[in-house]
Amino acid sequence: MEGTAQNLDVEVPKQDLPNGTDSTGEPPLKKVRLEEPASDQQNGQAPPRLKGVAPIKAEFLIPKPKQGQAAVSSTDDAAEAAAYKDREDEKKGKKKKTTGQNKNRTFGRSQDSKGLCASRVYSPEFSPAECPFGDKCRFEHDLRTYLKEHKREDLNTFNGVCPVWSARGKCDAGWKCRFVGSHSIERVTEDGRKELVLVEDEERRKKAQPVFPSAAEDGTVNTTSPADKIALAKRQRPTPRADAYSDWLDLTSKELEKYFHGGQQNKDAHPDTAQDKEEKEENRATYTEAPFMPSEKRRLYFGPETPALAPLTTQGNLPFRRLCVELGAQLTYSEMALSMPLIQGHKPEWALMRAHETEALPPTVSARASVVQDYDNSKDMKFGAQIAGNKYRWVMKATEVLSSLTPNLRVIDLNCGCPIDLLYREGSGSALLDAPSKLEKMLRGMNAVSEQIPITVKIRTGTRDNTPNAQKLVERLILGGHEASMLNCGPSGVAAITLHGRSRQQRYTREANWEYISETAALIKRLNEKSDEVTDTIREPEERMRPNGGKTWFLGNGDCYSHVDYEDHIKNAKVDSVMVGRGALIKPWLFEEIQAGQYLDKSASERLAYVEKFARYGMETWGSDEYGIGITRRFLLEWLSFACRYVPIGLLEYLPPKINDRPPYWRGRNDMETLMGSHDYRDWIKISEMFLGPAHKDFKFEPKHKSNSYDTEG
C-alpha cells in the first residue's frame, strides 16, 4: 500500500469497524508485554536510538513524500488554553500567512436549513403545543415539511439507531434528531389519518437511571440552573464571604504598607530579645483580624494508584474525560474557566463545570489511603474545577459561587501555569508566578470562602528558563509569607500543589525537568515533616490552619507517556502522584497501562472503538441533532489532531516511547492503522464520518496549524 501516516488517501470502509475487525478484516492485535530494547528481527541487532526521533522499525519506514508535512508541535499550547488564545485579536495590518497557527479560529455552524418550532419538537404531529408567536414565527410548523425539506436525511451509522435513545430510552433532540426514524412511528388515528409520533423505551429508561444521587436525568452533575445564571448576570446573587474577606485583604494591605514604610520590618524579622518578640506581638495586635476562619475541608488523598488527567482546555471536555475515567483515570479536572465570566453568569463558562456522574464517584484507592488522618473515601470524588484570574476579589467570588452552585467538586484548582500571552499580559496564569504575595492572598482567600472544598494550585518552574522560582513559591505557600507572619493568619491553606516541569518561556519545547520536580518533592517532604526545623521559626504555621492535618500533597506533571515514565516519577522523583496531559490525548489508554504495569499494543480497531465511544458520548452530551453532531465532530477532530501522533508500540525498535520524539514517515500494519496515524485533515474528516456521517455544508474546521485547515464546499 502507498502513502504515509502523515499524508494518506484511502477508501473508508463501510462496514461497522469497531465490532472486532479492522479494515483488512483481521481480528484485533493482542495486547502484549514489550520490554526495552525491541530487537531487529532481520539484522539481529537494533540500530542505535537517535535522540528526538521515534525509533520505528525499518520495515515500517517509507520514503519522504514530495509534499512537505506541517509540524504538529505547534498545537501543544492548545492543550493549555486554546479557547482563550483564540480570543486575542492578532489582526495588525500584516499580510495573512498560509503557515503558522490559526489564532482566530471559526468553525462555521451546523444547523437545519429552517429550524423546527420549539412547540413542535417533542409533540405528536396532530397535537402540537401552542406557539406563542403564531403566524409571525420564523420556524417551521409543519412537521412533514420540516422532515422532508429542511432537515438532512437520517444517518445510517450506529446501525441507524440513535445512540442517545439507545442509552437512555429517550432522545432529547426529538424530531430534530438525525436518527429520528429509530424512535418514531407512523400510527393510524381513529379517523383514519396517519400521524407521526415519537416513542420512548421504558425499559431502557429504567436501566439508565443515574447512579449518583444528585445527578440529572442525563447522568451529569454540577448543572447550574438558568435562574442562577441570570441572577449572576444581573448581580442579584450576593457573595458575602468573598466581599468581606476581600475588604479585609484591602485593609490589611494598607496597614502593612504603613508598617513596611515605617522601617520596622528589619527589626521584627529577626527578634533577638524577649523585648523584641514582645514588641512584635504588640504590632500583630494592631492589625485587623480576619472576619472569619476557613471552614474545615474534606481530607484529600493522592497516591500512586490515583493518576490524574490534567485540565485540558478544549480537549478536556466531558466526553473525553468520561472516556479517560472508563480507561482508569482516577482524578479529572474541568477545562480552565475564567473567574470574571463565571461571576457574570456566562453560560459557556458554567458549561465547563458539568461532569459525568462517573466523575462524581470516589476514586479507587489502596489501603494506604486509610493512614491519612480523617480521609473518607466514600465522600471523595474524582472531578475538580480549575479557574484562572488576575484579581483576588474575582477568584474569591468565583470560588464562593462554585462552592454553593456546584458542590460536587473534589477541589477548586487555581491555574498559575498557563503560558498563553493573552492571560499572561492580563496578570493571570503563569504571570502569578512572579507575584508571590498576590498569589498567596488569592489562595488564602479562596480557602476562606470555599466551605468544605479544598483549594489546590498548578504552577510551572517559573516564567523564564534561567530563573526558576517554584521552590521559593512552594515554601511560601506551605509556610506563609512574611506578611502572613505579621498578620498571624497562618499559611495559605493550599491542599495540593502540581508542578509542571517547564517554564513559561519554554512552553512545550525540550523535555520537562523532572530533576527539578524531584528536588521540589524533597523540599515539600521536609516542610511537611519537619516544619519546626525551618530557619525562620517565627513563620512556623499553626497545625489547625494547615490542610490535611499538616500534609500538602505534591503532583508532578510533564511528558508522562507510558507506565514506565509514571513508575519512574513515583519511585525516583518521589511525587505523590502524576498528572497526565498530552500523553492522555495521544493515547487515552495510558491509564490502563499504568494500572496493568505494562505496554498495551492497541490495534487499529480497538483505537477506532474509542473514537466510536467519543462520538456516542459527544451526542449524549451535546445532542444528536444537526447542531449537536456538529459540536461533537468539532471536538472529535480536536482530539484526533493529537491522537494522530501515536506511533503503535509494535512498530518501535526501542522502548519506552518518548512524547517529544518526532517520527519519520511510516506506514501501519494495515490500512486503518495508517489512516489513524495520518496528520492530514482530510483523513480526520473521514474518520469522523464513519460515525457522524458527512459533514454539514456550512461546517468549517480550523486546526491550530493553518496547513491542516478544512472547509466544506457547498
From Swiss-Prot:
CDD domains: DUS_like_FMN (cd02801). The keyword Cell membrane does not apply. A zinc finger (C3H1-type) spans 111-144, 161-186. FMN binds at P311, L312, T313, Q386, K458, H500, N557, G558, D559, G581, R582. It is found in: Cytoplasm; Nucleus. Its main location: cytoplasm. Residues 1-111, 202-238, 261-285 are annotated as: Disordered. The keyword rRNA-binding does not apply. GO terms for biological process: mRNA processing. The active site is at C418 (proton donor). Residues 83-92, 267-284 have a biased composition (Basic and acidic residues). GO terms for cellular component: cytoplasm; nuclear periphery. Its cofactor is FMN. Pfam families: Dus. GO terms for molecular function: flavin adenine dinucleotide binding; mRNA dihydrouridine synthase activity; tRNA dihydrouridine synthase activity; tRNA-dihydrouridine47 synthase activity; zinc ion binding. SUPFAM superfamilies: FMN-linked oxidoreductases. Keywords: Cytoplasm, Flavoprotein, FMN, Metal-binding, mRNA processing, NAD, NADP, Nucleus, Oxidoreductase, Repeat, tRNA processing, Zinc, Zinc-finger. It catalyses: 5,6-dihydrouridine(47) in tRNA + NAD(+) = uridine(47) in tRNA + NADH + H(+); 5,6-dihydrouridine(47) in tRNA + NADP(+) = uridine(47) in tRNA + NADPH + H(+); a 5,6-dihydrouridine in mRNA + NAD(+) = a uridine in mRNA + NADH + H(+); a 5,6-dihydrouridine in mRNA + NADP(+) = a uridine in mRNA + NADPH + H(+). Its EC number is 1.3.1.89, 1.3.1.-. PANTHER family: TRNA-DIHYDROURIDINE(47) SYNTHASE [NAD(P)(+)]-LIKE. Catalyzes the synthesis of dihydrouridine, a modified base found in the D-loop of most tRNAs. Specifically modifies U47 in cytoplasmic tRNAs. Catalyzes the synthesis of dihydrouridine in some mRNAs, thereby affecting their translation. Belongs to the Dus family. Dus3 subfamily. This is tRNA-dihydrouridine(47) synthase [NAD(P)(+)]. It comes from Emericella nidulans (strain FGSC A4 / ATCC 38163 / CBS 112.46 / NRRL 194 / M139) (Aspergillus nidulans).
